[in-house]
């Protein structure tokens, strides 16, 4: 079967997948999966030392088979080793903290008919690999190899698709915490920018702030669009919570920062 690759760059600067060094270094002995279960709150995502950006597999929502779900209990990490339902990569997530924060801007690669419900587009996975600054996983439902790496202020994702139609989704309505409020604007055929509200560290509703991002694609997509879904609510008289997002075909790239959008694009 002929394979095709798309490169997704979540970047303030270009990110590079490094070649393996011939001599072993201390970094080669690191196991990023340490602390990813038994409430260790760590994650195996790609991040550099003191880096602002991290790219983390998100597997804590969408499946009744998950051992842990972010909305079923106090939960502070986008990843748990024993969960096996992947709904995308989260960006800017924290590792090793005891309260939920960040872990949003979820990007997901799919194939076949388009669906924007994470319960439907989520998938089981296998062949996880992680090393300092790198993570990869194979998505069973789609036959897609997903890879991620990071620089201090950027990240890059590379997807190897089977032949056929592929999609990359940017879900702004879901994340580790459930703040409502997001905006996305098309800048050109290959670039969008937007804002997402984050915060409520330790479920403190007053601690909310915006994060700004720019998303660029390496190829002009054949089609693109937006979706908005209402989150199900229980025990409230009325509440409006938009589930914003954008879908595009083929390849995308994003910038992430706590600066304004035009400053993000400059980075």
Each language-model region and where it sits:
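Sec/Tat signal peptide C-region and signal peptidase I cleavage site
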Residues: 19-23
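Bacterial N-terminal signal peptides that target proteins for export
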Residues: 1-8
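Single conserved hydrophobic/aromatic residue that forms the stacking wall/gate
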Residues: 258, 265-267
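Accessory carbohydrate-recognition regions in carbohydrate-active enzymes
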Residues: 24-255, 259-260
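Bacterial N-terminal signal peptides
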Residues: 9-17
